Amino acid sequence: MTLRKSRRLYLIPVLSKALDILELLQAENQPMTLEAIHRQTKISKTTVYRVLKTYVHRGYLVQSPDGLYRQVSRPKKLRFGFGGQSVDMPFSVEVTESLKNAAASVGVDLLILDNCYDAATAMHNAEEFVKNRVDLVIEFQIEQEAAPVIADKIAAAKIPMIAIDIPHPHATYFGVDNYRVGFEAGEVLGAHALQEWGRKADWVLGLDLPEAGLLVQSRITGAFEGVRGVIADLPVECFVRIDGRGMRDRSRKLISDFLDRHPNEHHILIAAATDTSALGAVDAVRECGREKHVAIVGQDCIAEAIEEMTREGSPLIGSVSHEASSYGPNLVHLGLSILRGQTVPPYNYVDHKVVTPQTLAHAQMLAHA
């Protein structure tokens, strides 16, 4: 037996004929009669008829009242690429889970890659999204300097992009109003100094995130203005920015060093760009036994920050919730709107709310009422 004949033993003749018919309809890209299909494929009319009826039954073709058959446009399943900030950052994990649930609920596939809080990794992941030809990219990475490189790779592939919290060229912005969430955090700090320390504040520290760029840095700008709105006569020298990089251990060391250098100052306000930074400051304050001398407000309202705020005498007096659970549904809705060609705003802000030990206690009381 020749090799050619042995290979034919594995073929299914009727399936080959069915594929010939489908490929003809795809190539012609217009309605066809049974007679025309029979004539061009040279397949028996009986077989053509049965194959066409099977395709109609399975939804691959439709038959019009005049007897013409045409292929049904079967839209492919959409696939979004998501570059998560880091699996080690609680807020990023919450956003990822919210996005996974929202995408699954509408039948959108997700290609999830971890940016590992690292610019080089984020740029490599952008190349992976292009290689995999995703329909849309949702980018959540921290390095402003990497943003134009990532954005250019995605734009060159003609893939639309949504950027979370940090603006990227060519991308639609999605996230918090950074200045506003900072301002409201500052108001909480100012109110604490007013009520607990008789309007005294020796220092107002901002645990900043400069690598994320000016927009994210406006969280600290807003916090300083929020404090000034309550205590207007504070000298400019008492406002100090410290680069905490949004990381817990780094923030702990920096605040610990600051407290060691200022042992006799008992009215220190700290605004942190993230709760992870805020919790590092809490660690430092607790290690130094300075809980009564320091008040801290964070951003994101992650689970550990909520738990910390319920502790008696905690220096963490508040956090601004960015409502991570709302990110997923809103991102998916925004992404689908972009792909449908709808006009969307260049900046899309999420809702936020201030959470304090008092609001937590009130919510718990209502839950048990």
Where are these regions (language model features)?
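Hinge/cleft segment of the Venus flytrap/periplasmic-binding protein
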Residues: 78, 215, 227, 322-369
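Short helix-capping segments at alpha-helix termini
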Residues: 104-106, 157-159, 227-235, 262-264, ...
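Hydrophobic alpha-helical
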Residues: 129-130, 136-155, 223, 243-308
